[in-house]
Amino acid sequence: MITSVLRYVLALYFCMGIAHGAYFSQFSMRAPDHDPCHDHTGRPVRCVPEFINAAFGKPVIASDTCGTNRPDKYCTVKEGPDGIIREQCDTCDARNHFQSHPASLLTDLNSIGNMTCWVSTPSLSPQNVSLTLSLGKKFELTYVSMHFCSRLPDSMALYKSADFGKTWTPFQFYSSECRRIFGRDPDVSITKSNEQEAVCTASHIMGPGGNRVAFPFLENRPSAQNFENSPVLQDWVTATDIKVVFSRLSPDQAELYGLSNDVNSYGNETDDEVKQRYFYSMGELAVGGRCKCNGHASRCIFDKMGRYTCDCKHNTAGTECEMCKPFHYDRPWGRATANSANSCVACNCNQHAKRCRFDAELFRLSGNRSGGVCLNCRHNTAGRNCHLCKPGFVRDTSLPMTHRKACKSCGCHPVGSLGKSCNQSSGQCVCKPGVTGTTCNRCAKGYQQSRSTVTPCIKIPTKADFIGSSHSEEQDQCSKCRIVPKRLNQKKFCKRDHAVQMVVVSREMVDGWAKYKIVVESVFKRGTENMQRGETSLWISPQGVICKCPKLRVGRRYLLLGKNDSDHERDGLMVNPQTVLVEWEDDIMDKVLRFSKKDKLGQCPEITSHRY
């Protein structure tokens, strides 16, 4: 099917002549009457630029041209009306417009009756003469057609580049001796495993094409019927430049002229006379194809910088519409197909961000629905879609999420709250002990305001809190408080099960016991109870309260060394005779870290049964 269609296109092209290519080139920039990239309902659909002769008017560079250094004489043989083959000679002079044969004539406007020809310098060994055509951007090509003004070359090769001539890939080889000239077996079968392999053939000499050689890019390629889903063939037909390299004009002179078998008929001629018949001459180099836009544009235009580029639709961008335009990264870019235009979709940032990125993992987890992640959310918003309020702000439900003031400040009291954050649903700030209110702006029932910024609200004392505190006989039972030692050493650290740095937040009396609310800030030794950072309680017995052993102050930091005590029924830590409490100072950190390191390495001093 593909082969017959290509042959039909080639036949139609040949019948109309080069003017057909000029026609499409002339109107390829004109905007269509309707947008082919959307159907009548506005739904995006695949669209492609018009089929044109991509070579028309494009520059061609020849490695060799006759008459460049000096006038050259070249001769051809033609069959006259009487059937007699006669030799006709002309002069090529690049300085004379009427006698010059530059490579630019290959892509100009030709007609069947007025064929202008490029001619190479006549030579006894005309090898490795090349023609390089630059298309200016990527095209998806259907065929390359070459119309020769003289006898067809015996051996030549077609190459393509997809990176503006930096690298070259062979397209097709032509030769009557493929193995000798190109080191390739002739007419190799193409399978799906070698669809990008260049084939060597002698069909140009043996076929009925006369002086024209045409190479259809997809002919005999197995995946041509499924081109949309074949990245291999899509790459195969993509090119920015085409190069033709002539390797051999003819195996021998007699074959060149199609004369009698008497190869010595020109034996008396000089080398200069013989070489006048050895040259390459081509009148037309045509390349049929479409501007490559990956199904996202119906035409190509010149941009403000003068570059030939696709007029991209479907929220795509790039010279070939090969990427999504900025802020349209909610889905991955894809080539448009007959079933899906694969339009790029804008990120959903609720109008709070101007930039976003694509996250493939999020896209997969969403069931291939959304993968956009908003960047630099503004207006105090946060989240991948700027759909949340950042810490310190809460949603104003009276306004839509797209409003620039959709997130308002929590307004947490700087003294009564533990931070600036609040509950995203209720707006409730996190209050310090004894503080209440949505913004933590007042003392709770049973508490009174203090002058401390650490504990702004303290519990109002009751008579029960002071029972027994004035009994002198109990005070007489108090001895020296060993819980607060004069100095801290390695042995004390090693004998205790846990070691933490804590800050005292509040104090209250419960049945004669002093209950301190503390926050463990650092853990140097966890013990079997697996001490963790965070809020907990520290209990001091009634006797310790009376004796003020230890004497703790709200807002101060301490180093607490203790033994595991799971017998008591109170939650938190218990101060007992084995507890060591040292008020935290700046120079204590290094000492504690040193003790902790030795303890972990088993370098503790020998421990006796003495209590300390």
Swiss-Prot record:
Main localization category: secreted
Keywords for this entry?
Basement membrane, Disulfide bond, Extracellular matrix, Glycoprotein, Laminin EGF-like domain, Neurogenesis, Repeat, Secreted, Signal
| Sugar attachment sites | N114, N128, N268, N368, N423, N564
Q: Tell me which positions the record assigns to the signal sequence.
A: 1-21
Would the keyword Secreted turn up in this protein's UniProt record?
Answer: yes
| Disulfide bond positions | C117-C149, C291-C300, C293-C310, C312-C321, C324-C344, C347-C356, C349-C374, C377-C386, C389-C407, C410-C422, C412-C429, C431-C440, C443-C457, C478-C547, C494-C604
Got a GO cellular component term for this one?
A: axon
What Gene3D superfamilies does its record include? 2.40.50.120, Galactose-binding domain-like, Laminin
Give the Laminin N-terminal domain ranges. Answer: 43-290
Q: What happens when the gene is disrupted?
A: Defective gonad distal tip cell (DTC) migration whereby DTCs migrate towards the midbody of the hermaphrodite on the ventral side rather than the dorsal side of the body resulting in ventrally located gonad arms. Double knockout with mig-38 RNAi results in failed gonad DTC migration to the midbody of the hermaphrodite.
> What are the subcellular locations of this protein?
Secreted, Extracellular space, Extracellular matrix, Basement membrane
Q: What does this protein do?
A: Component of an extracellular matrix cue that guides dorsoventral migrations on the epidermis. Required for the guidance of pioneer axons and migrating cells along the body wall. In particular, it is required for the guidance of axons from neurons, including SubL neurons and AIY interneurons, into the nerve ring. During gonad morphogenesis, involved in distal tip cell (DTC) migration from the dorsal side of the hermaphrodite body to the midbody to allow for formation of gonad arms. Its association with either unc-40 or unc-5 receptors will lead to axon attraction or repulsion, respectively.
The UniProt comment on domains reads: Mutations that delete the second laminin EGF-like repeat impair only dorsal migrations of mesodermal cells and axons.
User: Self-association or partners: how does it assemble?
Assistant: Binds to unc-5 and unc-40 receptors.
- Protein name as annotated: Netrin unc-6
